[in-house]
Amino acid sequence: MKTTLLRLSRRAACLVLAGGLLTSCSLLPAASPRHEGTASSQAPQYYSDAWLSDDSLHYVYSYAGNGGGTILRGGRVLYKASSSDSIQLLKDTLTGETGHYLVAHSTPGTEERTSTLYDADGNAVMTFPYAVSATLSGGLLILNDAADVWAFENGTTGGTRVYDLATGVQLPVPETALDCLVVDEDGQRLIFNCYDLPEGLTYAYDDPDQPLHQYVLITDREGNVLLREDGCTASTLASYRGGFADWLDLSWFRGADWGIAREALYNVTTGELLTGEEDSAVSACGVGVACLQSRQDSRSVLYDLNSGEAVELGRFDWCVMDYTPGCVTLLGSDDPDNPYTLIDLASGEKTAVQRSDTDYHSGNVAVLTANNVLKIYDGTTGALLTDVEVTPVEEGHYVSLTALPDGYALLQYNSENYDTVAIQTYSGDGLLWSSAGEAQQYTYASYLTNTANGPLLTAHRDNSDSSNLSDVLDMEGNLLLRRLGSCYSIDDLPDDCFIARQGFDYGLMDSTGQWLYRESIFSSPSDDAGGGYLY
């Protein structure tokens, strides 16, 4: 029999009716006009709306770095924050969609803060009379009071609230909840990490057995308890493409020392429980693929969790680092000089590997074998994209490997003193560029963005004036742009788009040097303090 042990949260949020979303609330003004904030129509414009046409939400941090920033939809400004605003762009942890953003505002003349949730059109959807942090999972909005972030330290719980974003309905939450997780895409199961403060105690830090008084509750939307696990905590699994649908990582505490006795994979929809080897630990190894590894001897079991039930893919002597269809990379080797092993799952062939890396944009897995062969596997199909010999640099004492989209890779060689002696790029055709022998070396290079002609790199060298400036290179080492400040990429930007600063402007730029969106560094309300940077 199901038991209902829940109550609605102690605070009632004022919810804004947006197109019939909610039924009891007051209407808010347009999204942008806030104290010190700038409406989109008032924002200084140095660009064309058509230049950034992906129609997605993007957050450009304030140049000053402390509060502020700009929310874009494509190239259109939805919200330009004041220095006292803080913005959180909400990406659904399961679907990967980014359709909302949350702004915390200061109340003029007071130390109080309020929060407003906006949709992708800049319309206010919900408002709260206090600061909150938010997570969006499976269409459910999970809120925690900013003031309750450390509430667990004094035994206070119950600062978590959950709303169905489609209807605005607030769902029941346990009084003892510390947080909430959602792993099924329909949002039918709610997972709560909870803590019971023992009777007679006022503060959690006075509890000598805190871990043993934590527990996991799984409920339905009505608050009916479907599962309780004592002395346990729950966490989600995630790959470069987002969360694992329906699966949780459950960890049971060993005792009061917070040590973990064992972990297991649990399917909240089917109830399937995978325990693996004794004293196991859980790790994600690919899209919907996870490993259960023994803490005693590193033996591991690999599971495909993409279908309704788990499918065992293999058992191995070491922990699985990365999986692509057809092969795995293990953290361990019979060769003391090479820390990794590549195994072909069809033939069972083992290859010693000196370096391994996964490109989190594409999921491609790159390995540099002990005999200096570079292999790159497609993260989705497992197809071998690149299989070429690498030309080692004689002066190189250390080598690092970076996997890039479309079968490309970046190698960097360092001396015994960790000075860069060469940067190399490779594709399926072999070596594209090597900086070995150049009079002045870049100190490092990293992935910037992808284009129709292949990835681009941002490369930095120490300048005599101590300036922190970067160049933009293609994979053949050609210089496309030079001496840019704050040149880097953030998640979910379209191809051929990155963040840069040039002179007194910063924003989004493409590889031709064309601004897709830009602001003056002096447009930030905090610039009079001097300095600052763009994240």
Where is each model-derived feature located?
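C-terminal motif of bacterial Sec signal peptides marking the signal peptidase cleavage site
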Residues: T23-S24
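Residue-level detector of conserved, function-critical positions
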Residues: P33-Y535
